Swiss-Prot record:
Its EC number is 6.3.4.5. NCBIfam families: argG, PRK00509.1. ATP binds at residues 13-21, 41, 123. Belongs to the argininosuccinate synthase family. Type 1 subfamily. This is Argininosuccinate synthase. The keyword Lipid metabolism does not apply. GO terms for cellular component: cytoplasm. PANTHER family: ARGININOSUCCINATE SYNTHASE. The lineage of its organism: Bacteria, Pseudomonadati, Pseudomonadota, Gammaproteobacteria, Alteromonadales. Pathway: Amino-acid biosynthesis; L-arginine biosynthesis; L-arginine from L-ornithine and carbamoyl phosphate: step 2/3. Homotetramer. It is found in: Cytoplasm.
């Protein structure tokens, strides 16, 4: 299937997994005289995933392989800003895969410019969200570059056909037909899809989960952490200041040991279909709960309602791959303004799969025990409520009278 399109040099987003292992030789065979450069994004997927990846890329057809450490930038410039908005997609998904795509696309474009490439290539399938996320970022950052999406071109249609393709060319791979789950990992989370999970009536087996302890097997005693928050950002745990990345790693370790952060959801993909995924986001779940605790104290009713609107809009923006847009900048600016008052400390309790903000305080707290008390009250005249209620319910009263 020789391509008629002329491409001189292409940068491939390379993971070393089955799909991208096939893409390198496929490009070599189907694009004449095209130099292939592999780009590997280290977003915290783990040392095991990266071990030997440069040698593997070169052996599979790449002329060069760039491994770029993006872990700190991912947490500081993508995860922390998203946390500040409060974004949670469809009320459950903490956007682990979605947040990583724009930084990977951005770094891929930077490598392309560095090596003088005229094309970009990704290994996303034609059924998923990631093809849209990557290509939307490419369009915003490098509209002049050609984009190659092999899954929308080639005649390889299954995992088995990819394995056969590599076997015919004596290209080694750790993948096998029995490794049935599709997984995506970074510093924030790991996702699991495929296999028996494709039937939502099937309960996830124990082998699905890889990052967190089964809540049943978690410690029988709870663990407590004190989370410090400054302007909507977590700055310290138990009084120890850490970088955003190190904070996340610490909370991942602590929360995973208690089985915190597991979700099993059916989500609406951008391409129109529903998909089922199991996600593990231990540290992130603790962070979201801690920030929610501060938010409850410091934002008044109408401001919090607006914050929830920002959160919902931003969750769809990130999920849909629209990071490099004016809307993203606007929503981040709004979240930054709202976060000015989000300062304080929260004590969270982790126990057998759950995390709760059980104590909270803030110098900007709007909570007044004097006004809220059910005991003796000298600051609030309860008789004042009568006039408010009559005005508040006036439209209902008028409608009822008019219908008589």
């Amino acid at each position: 299937m020789k391509m008629t399109q002329t491409v001189k040099k292409v940068v491939v987003a390379y993971s070393g997994g089955l799909d991208t292992s096939v893409i390198l030789p496929w490009l070599q065979e189907n694009y004449d005289n095209c130099e292939i450069v592999a780009f590997v994004a280290d977003v915290g997927q783990g040392a095991e995933e990266l071990e030997g990846i440069e040698a593997k890329a070169l052996a599979s057809g790449a002329s060069e392989c760039y491994v770029v450490d993006l872990k700190d930038e991912l947490v500081e410039n993508y995860i922390y800003p998203t946390l500040k908005t409060g974004a949670v997609y469809e009320g459950t998904y903490l956007l682990g895969t979605s947040m990583a795509r724009p930084i990977i696309a951005k770094a891929q474009v930077e490598i392309a410019r560095k090596v003088g490439a005229d094309a970009l290539c990704h290994g996303c399938t034609g059924k998923g969200n990631d093809q849209i996320r990557f290509e939307s970022c490419f369009a915003a950052l490098a509209p002049e570059l050609t984009v190659i999406a092999p899954w929308r071109i080639w005649d390889l249609t299954s995992r088995e056909s990819l394995l056969e393709y590599l076997a015919e060319r004596d290209i080694p791979t750790a993948a096998s037909a029995t490794k049935i789950y599709s997984r995506d990992a970074n510093a924030w989370h790991i996702s699991h899809e495929g296999g028996e999970l494709e039937d939502p009536w099937n309960q996830p087996s124990k082998q699905v989960w890889t990052m967190t302890v089964d809540p049943i097997d978690a410690p029988n005693e709870p663990e407590f952490l004190t989370i410090s928050v400054v302007k909507g950002e977590i700055t310290a745990v138990n009084g120890e200041a850490m970088s955003p990345y190190n904070t996340l790693m610490y909370l991942n370790e602590k929360a995973a040991a208690h089985g915190v952060g597991r979700v099993d959801i059916v989500e609406n993909r951008l391409v129109g279909m529903k998909s089922r995924g199991c996600y593990e986001t231990p540290g992130g779940t603790v962070m979201v709960e801690a920030l929610r605790g501060i938010e409850e104290l410091v934002l008044d009713k109408t401001t919090r309602k607006w914050k929830q609107t920002v959160a919902a809009e931003f969750s769809h923006l990130v999920y849909d791959g629209r990071w490099f847009t004016p809307l993203c900048a606007s929503l981040l600016a709004a979240a930054g303004t709202l976060a000015e008052e989000m300062n304080g400390e929260v004590i969270v309790k982790m126990y057998k799969g759950s995390v709760q903000a059980i104590q909270k305080k803030s110098p900007n707290s709007l909570y007044s025990e004097e006004f809220a008390t059910f005991g003796d009250d000298n600051v609030y005249d309860q008789s004042h409520a009568e006039g408010f209620i009559r005005l508040y319910s006036l439209s209902s009263r008028i409608k009822a009278l008019a219908s008589k």
